[in-house]
Amino acid sequence: MRFAWTVLLLGPLQLCALVHCAPPAAGQQQPPREPPAAPGAWRQQIQWENNGQVFSLLSLGSQYQPQRRRDPGAAVPGAANASAQQPRTPILLIRDNRTAAARTRTAGSSGVTAGRPRPTARHWFQAGYSTSRAREAGASRAENQTAPGEVPALSNLRPPSRVDGMVGDDPYNPYKYSDDNPYYNYYDTYERPRPGGRYRPGYGTGYFQYGLPDLVADPYYIQASTYVQKMSMYNLRCAAEENCLASTAYRADVRDYDHRVLLRFPQRVKNQGTSDFLPSRPRYSWEWHSCHQHYHSMDEFSHYDLLDANTQRRVAEGHKASFCLEDTSCDYGYHRRFACTAHTQGLSPGCYDTYGADIDCQWIDITDVKPGNYILKVSVNPSYLVPESDYTNNVVRCDIRYTGHHAYASGCTISPY
């Protein structure tokens, strides 16, 4: 029984040995064996220097060859083996250095140079760079010929810069930074700048002026909210410090509970020019008013007069109003860039400097004025301290009917005088 199991196990093994060890047939030829390849030589891959010591990283592996395009003009039948034997170098460029001269060769010149090996074109690439634009830019640089009115091709990696502007001078640039005020050139995210080659009329900052400002007072704003109010001298102490009352309010016999009659009216001035309206006084000479807690940047921004309707004679002393200039509001598409601070004061193009009728010094003291018909004259930039493109729209005249207790304004218009 044990012998039978041994025969069954050794039988297949002997059969396999006979099959593998049998000599090949006469018609079959065994391919010759190639000698083993010699081990690759050590090649230097990376070398660097640190603290005066040179380090090298050696490897037996093959050198990495990045993928590159084959020049269409160099594709010649039968040249595959020759090109495979040529050493390849890593691609380290970012543009295509092929010139346009190869494209404009004549048939004769191409025939002469057919036997010469053409240099392999190196293709330079970078993320975000267009290959077609790179070829066009390379061709224009190689030809070195540009039409008189033609602008050379520019890379799309960097937009063209303006020559007449300064760096960071665009008021619509969201990354513009100013050490004076973080809200200077404030960029409104809800109002994107319109694309186009021309700048909008609001372009202009303190560094780069585009034309001149043009102040215009709103006559309808004055007419809508003119009224009479009585206030005690106790509540007018801050206004008295800024000389906002009539001369009779500064007499020695005036007491705190005495009342003054005030003709109140609002004012809204718009800069419809193409440049910023900046204060006439330099920043170091601005006056700080502790009572109102702000700086006055102009000696006389507005002037108020009450004239007799028949004789045009002044019946109430005019008031010099030196305000804190700022962009209270702006038209759609324009942005606030000035605030009533110690650093930035002014009026941007397309913006308004608004003063309500309830603030201090926005009035004329009419305590000594009798009832009758008068003319309210409001002048903006009356002394022409700041240059403007048009001075004929700086005055507003309104007809005032004063009853002794109430005042009614009508017929407010812009006047040249």
Swiss-Prot record:
Residues 213-417 are annotated as: Lysyl-oxidase like. It is found in: Secreted; Secreted, Extracellular space. There is a cross-link at residues 320-355 (Lysine tyrosylquinone (Lys-Tyr)). It holds the Pfam family Lysyl_oxidase. The modification 2',4',5'-topaquinone is found at residue 355. The keyword Disulfide bond applies. Its cofactor is Cu cation; lysine tyrosylquinone residue. Disulfide bonds join 238-244, 291-340, 324-330, 351-361, 398-412. Residues 73-84 have a biased composition (Low complexity). Contains 1 lysine tyrosylquinone. It is an enzyme of class 1 (oxidoreductase). Cu cation binds at residues 292, 294, 296. Residues 1-21 form the signal peptide. It is linked to Aortic aneurysm, familial thoracic 10: A form of thoracic aortic aneurysm, a disease characterized by permanent dilation of the thoracic aorta usually due to degenerative changes in the aortic wall. It is primarily associated with a characteristic histologic appearance known as 'medial necrosis' or 'Erdheim cystic medial necrosis' in which there is degeneration and fragmentation of elastic fibers, loss of smooth muscle cells, and an accumulation of basophilic ground substance. Belongs to the lysyl oxidase family. Responsible for the post-translational oxidative deamination of peptidyl lysine residues in precursors to fibrous collagen and elastin. Regulator of Ras expression. May play a role in tumor suppression. Plays a role in the aortic wall architecture. Interacts with MFAP4. Interacts (via propeptide) with EFEMP2; this interaction is strong and facilitates formation of ternary complexes with ELN during elastic fiber assembly; this interaction limits interaction of EFEMP2 with FBLN5. This is Protein-lysine 6-oxidase. It comes from Homo sapiens (Human).
